Amino acid sequence: FTGYATACLHEHLPKGSSLHSLEADAETAHKTQHFWQENHPSHQVQWHVGEALTVLPKLNLQPDFVFVDADKHNYSRYLDMCLPLLKTGGVMLFDNTLWSKRVIIEKDRESDRDTQNMHAFNAYANALPNVLVALLPIRDGITLVTKLD
């Protein structure tokens, strides 16, 4: 947990833009911020500590892009919370949505609750109106949700 995803996103961040990074665990957040400040100092990155479902509503953001890679069992809740805030044409990216390919193997879905949750999230996202959903079989799976209007 060194902020690698944040560093990758920051590398392509347009001038005048900002990046908000949330971490639930205070100790991990402190280590990440320390590593980040030593290796990637930037005023474009704002750090927030706390549970995302609690912190996000307080930020008053209208993002173009949201990257979700934690708290997998709440992916649907993050989608419900962030989609109304997302600008039209904005994208949400959810990581690990093939769950080591178990999501596509029916016998694995039957026996593993985490796999069932991830499968349910993908089905839920795909059924939403006014979005375009793409599940990409890259590494552990990426689900992209684009807000159409």
Residue ranges, per PLM feature:
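S-adenosylmethionine/decaboxylated-SAM
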Residues: 1-149
